[in-house]
UniProtKB/Swiss-Prot annotation:
GO CC aspect terms: endoplasmic reticulum; Golgi apparatus; membrane
Membrane topology note: Multi-pass membrane protein
GO biological process, one term: vesicle-mediated transport
Membrane-crossing segments per the record: 87-107, 131-151, 164-184, 188-208, 228-248
Keyword Cell membrane: no
Protein name: Protein YIP5
Length: 249
C-alpha cells in the first residue's frame, strides 16, 4: 500500500539565516556594571580586625609631623593623628630618649673627669634606670589613665593614650642632648642651666598632655576632670624630677 507524503513548502522549518542584529548581539560580550570599589573597600576595612601590625603602619612624614606638633602644641594632637594613632613613633622616640639620657650622662661624667671633678667611665645601671623610668612611666601611666577613663564611661582608646604619652617623650630628647656642654661650667651655673632646661621640657610636655586630655577627661565630670589633670601634672613633675636627679644633676 503506497502512502503519499505531502510536504508543505510554505511551512517554517526553522531559520536558516542570521540577521545582522542577531549576529552583532552574539559577538558583543556581556559586560557587568563596575562594582563600587570604594564602598567595598571601606566595608572590608571595617570588617578586618585590628592587629598590632596596623599600629606600626605609618609613614615617616606622619611621625615627623606629630613630633613637631608635640614640641609646638598649638593644635589638638588627635586632629593631627586623624584617627590613625600609631606605636611606631612612640616606641622609637622612647628608645631614642633612653639612649640619649645614657649618652648625655656618660658625656657629662667624662667632662667632669677631664676637669678633675669626677671619675671616668659609664654605669650600665644608668641605662637600666633610664629604660625602667621611661618605658615604665609611658606604659603604666597611659594604661592607668585609660582604665580610669573607661571606668567613668569616657570610652577612650588605649592606643590613643599610649600614642599620646609616647610622643610626649620627644621633649626629653633635646633636653638630654643640650645638657652635656654645660657640664664644663661651674657647679652652680651648670645646675641652674640644667634645671632651666628640664623646666622648659616639663612645661612643654605638660601643656601638650593637658591640652589634649582635657576634652576627654571633661566627659567624666568637672570634679573628676580636675582631679585627673592634677594627677597627670603631678606624675609628670615626678618624672622630670627623677630625670633631673639621676641624669642631669
Amino acid at each position: 500500500m503506497a502512502h503519499e507524503i505531502e510536504i508543505d513548502s510554505e511551512a517554517d522549518l526553522g531559520r536558516t539565516t542570521f540577521e545582522a542584529e542577531d549576529l552583532y548581539k552574539q559577538r558583543t560580550p556581556i559586560t557587568k556594571p563596575p562594582a563600587p570599589r570604594l564602598q567595598s573597600r571601606r566595608a572590608s576595612m571595617q570588617e578586618t580586625p585590628w592587629t598590632i601590625k596596623d599600629s606600626f603602619n605609618v609613614e615617616t612624614k606622619d611621625v615627623v609631623q606629630r613630633c613637631i606638633h608635640t614640641l609646638i602644641p598649638t593644635v589638638n594632637f588627635f586632629d593631627v593623628v586623624d584617627d590613625r594613632p600609631d606605636l611606631y613613633g612612640p616606641f622609637w622616640i622612647t628608645t631614642t630618649v633612653i639612649q640619649a639620657l645614657f649618652f648625655s650622662n656618660s658625656i657629662t661624667e667624662y667632662a667632669r673627669y677631664a676637669t678633675g671633678h669626677g671619675t671616668s667611665g659609664y654605669s650600665i645601671k644608668k641605662l637600666i634606670s633610664a629604660a625602667s623610668i621611661i618605658y615604665g612611666y609611658t606604659t603604666i601611666i597611659a594604661v592607668l589613665l585609660w582604665g580610669i577613663l573607661v571606668w567613668n564611661k569616657c570610652n577612650p582608646k588605649l592606643l590613643d593614650c599610649l600614642c599620646l604619652y609616647g610622643y610626649a617623650n620627644i621633649v626629653w630628647l633635646p633636653v638630654s642632648l643640650a645638657t652635656p656642654p654645660f657640664g664644663l661650667l661651674s657647679t652652680l651655673a651648670s645646675h641652674i642651666v640644667k634645671y632651666v632646661l628640664t623646666g622648659i621640657g616639663l612645661l612643654i610636655s605638660i601643656v601638650f598632655l593637658t591640652r589634649n586630655l582635657y576634652p576627654i577627661c571633661q566627659q567624666a565630670g568637672s570634679n573628676l576632670c580636675k582631679l585627673l589633670l592634677f594627677g597627670i601634672i603631678v606624675f609628670h613633675c615626678l618624672l622630670a624630677l627623677s630625670l633631673q636627679l639621676i641624669f642631669f644633676s
